[in-house]
Design a protein with these regions (language model features):
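Sec-dependent bacterial lipoprotein signal peptides
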Residues: 1-6
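Residues within mature, well-folded domains
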Residues: 7-73
């Protein structure tokens, strides 16, 4: 039961806290470590998932520039 008490950080509440210009480190503090990231020419796309919920964030120069969410509760 203790494992179930650790709620996912992939929530609408946390998504709403993500602001343009936040650093990658600040974002990881808020959402936890991403499922994965891909990088091309200094642009990173990172993805956080939980069940049907997903947050994708694009970082340029280590700063949030674009955020997309699906299925958040």
């Amino acid at each position: 039961m203790l494992l179930l008490s650790g709620c996912s950080k992939v929530t609408k509440e946390n998504y709403d806290k993500i602001k343009s210009g936040m650093s990658y480190e600040e974002t990881v503090e808020l959402l936890g470590k991403p499922e994965g990231c891909s990088e091309t020419l200094g642009i990173s796309n990172c993805e956080w998932k939980n069940d049907d919920a997903k947050i994708v964030i694009t970082f340029i120069s280590n700063q949030v520039t674009i955020t997309v969410a699906e299925g958040l509760k």
